[in-house]
Amino acid sequence: MDEVAAYQAAHPKNKEHFIAENQLEDKPIIALLAGSRKQEIKDNLPDMLKAASAFPDYQLVLAGAPAIAPEYYKQYVGEAKVKIIFDQTYSLLQHADVALVTSGTATLETALFRVPQVVCYYTPIGKVVSFLRRHILTVRFISLVNLIADREVVKELVADTMTVKNMQNELRNIIENEAYRNEMLSGY
């Protein structure tokens, strides 16, 4: 938390500079934080891109993980219209309007930057994970935001519930429903 506060104090918000520096369009931003490990990126990024691409009034900006080579992303990006930026995750969050975020510390960082988000986490053994979550595991949430609040502040689409349609519905709800968006932000 201190790291985010220090960043915000040292880097006043300047969207025009961020757009120019990264050759972005002057459009609202859907930030994509697809994880920091190759398997997470492989499992999550393709559907995140499909879901976010349904919003043509927004531009897609992907936070590249520092330990992942730019070439690795190319196999999953395909023809999607997305800009990949590295070493600027906090700047991206500072200027994002909404985010799709793979579960992990990034969910808490996204909340600290007050960006409405959908938490996404797919696993190839989704049905098994869903069964375990419903019948065996006692942890109700996977995102740090919800775990800390001990209630659902942000929607978690995990395993078999992480579908393109569900992500699109949740993004649409955040974008179009101001009361829903504000309720999420007040939960931060």
Positions of PLM-derived features:
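Nucleotide-activated sugar donor-binding and catalytic core shared by glycosyltransferases
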Residues: 1-188
